[in-house]
């Protein structure tokens, strides 16, 4: 099992990142690849989960051990595979997910991509009482202040119905550019619709 990989972010796309570690590029699927955008110039530590089946050998990576451990727990639920686990982690915080499972809040769990009533019930059945280490809220990551135009563009995206979690994924990439509000919205929509 590979605990973590420390290296430089070589490539980022909507599904995965490539970490260059001593000249070897590791393709690592993550819930939010663009969260690694700010780490492009410095070495980054990616906590990994190695998924091996007869037809698949893949690495899944996370910013924290907590996220990685929750991903491993999600894979224990019947009906949730790696793609489903990543989608759930991309759409919510570990403490919110743990709280919903402990409180048997099926309606909240059904809001996650790919989770219907049957899967929500299975998550509660399989994970209730096993996620106490995730129930403490995680400290929010410090965010750099946004320009007025970017803040207006984000408000427009929210008005169009995009979830805050989806928008947070693309903010680091948008921050690198200086544009008008309209240009930010167009660029963001292009990124979100990929």
Curated annotation (Swiss-Prot):
- Chain intervals for the UniProt region annotation (Domain I): 1-63
Q: Map out region (Domain II) in residue numbers.
A: 64-142
Q: What is the lineage of its organism?
A: Bacteria, Bacillati, Bacillota, Bacilli, Bacillales
Would the keyword Repeat be found if you checked this record's keyword annotation? Answer: no
> What quaternary structure, including any partners, is listed in this protein's UniProt entry?
Homotetramer. Forms an RuvA(8)-RuvB(12)-Holliday junction (HJ) complex. HJ DNA is sandwiched between 2 RuvA tetramers; dsDNA enters through RuvA and exits via RuvB. An RuvB hexamer assembles on each DNA strand where it exits the tetramer. Each RuvB hexamer is contacted by two RuvA subunits (via domain III) on 2 adjacent RuvB subunits; this complex drives branch migration. In the full resolvosome a probable DNA-RuvA(4)-RuvB(12)-RuvC(2) complex forms which resolves the HJ.
Family of this protein: Belongs to the RuvA family.
Any one GO BP annotation for this protein: DNA recombination
Described purpose of this protein according to its UniProt entry: The RuvA-RuvB-RuvC complex processes Holliday junction (HJ) DNA during genetic recombination and DNA repair, while the RuvA-RuvB complex plays an important role in the rescue of blocked DNA replication forks via replication fork reversal (RFR). RuvA specifically binds to HJ cruciform DNA, conferring on it an open structure. The RuvB hexamer acts as an ATP-dependent pump, pulling dsDNA into and through the RuvAB complex. HJ branch migration allows RuvC to scan DNA until it finds its consensus sequence, where it cleaves and resolves the cruciform DNA.
Q: Which HAMAP family match?
A: DNA_HJ_migration_RuvA (MF_00031)
**What UniProt keywords are attached to this protein's entry?**
Cytoplasm, DNA damage, DNA recombination, DNA repair, DNA-binding
The Gene Ontology CC terms held by the record are: cytoplasm; Holliday junction helicase complex; Holliday junction resolvase complex
Q: What is its main location?
A: cytoplasm
Give the organism, scientific name. Answer: Geobacillus thermodenitrificans (strain NG80-2)
| Tree of life domain | Bacteria
The protein's name: Holliday junction branch migration complex subunit RuvA
Residues covered by region (Flexible linker): 143-147
InterPro entries per the UniProt record, alphabetical: DNA_helicase_Holl-junc_RuvA_I, Hlx-hairpin-Hlx_DNA-bd_motif, NA-bd_OB-fold, RuvA, RuvA_2-like, RuvA_C, RuvA_C_sf
Q: Any idea which GO molecular function terms this record carries?
A: ATP binding; four-way junction DNA binding; four-way junction helicase activity
